[in-house]
Amino acid sequence: AVVRPVSLAVHQPDWSRHAELVKGRPEVFQMRADGTRQPEVLCYGHPKTLETYLEGIRNAVAGNGKKYAPVSGKSITVSPADVELACYCEHCKKLWDKDGGQYGGASRVVAAFVDKLAREVKRRWPKEKFTVIYLPYLNYTAAPDGIKFPGNVEVQLCGMPGLAAYKEPAIRESEQKNLER
């Protein structure tokens, strides 16, 4: 049996370097307000993105290379590009929280994706015992109501106010409430 450790890969996967995805599956990339796609950022609301993630995991498990796969050891990373998410596609618009503020507008979009991914991974590859590592950051940091991740998800939250600000009681309380959700 192959032993794979749990390890982290940030801002993964980067599908912008796969021309066949950029041209053949543009819907997996974030849609700008003008309708063009931004290949450096994934669209986490479109079903094709989940399908492509799972295709990559299937390739990695089968030993067919790591094409499209955000797999590192026993870990599958969901860590969007280092920008705020702002996808204007119909799928993301349905999940967007207009009242989410600076830390929660895109939270439901990415959290729903992570939830679906983790459940599919657990169902399809139970023997692999993969951990889906989710790194909430920027405008998808606030935990959305109504999503309870399965046990194969590890959340590594980035506290957006910055560590030094935690000395302020209001910030500390707000961040603690988010952690407890």
Predicted regions and their residues:
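Catalytic-core regions of glycoside hydrolase
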Residues: A1-E51, E55-R181
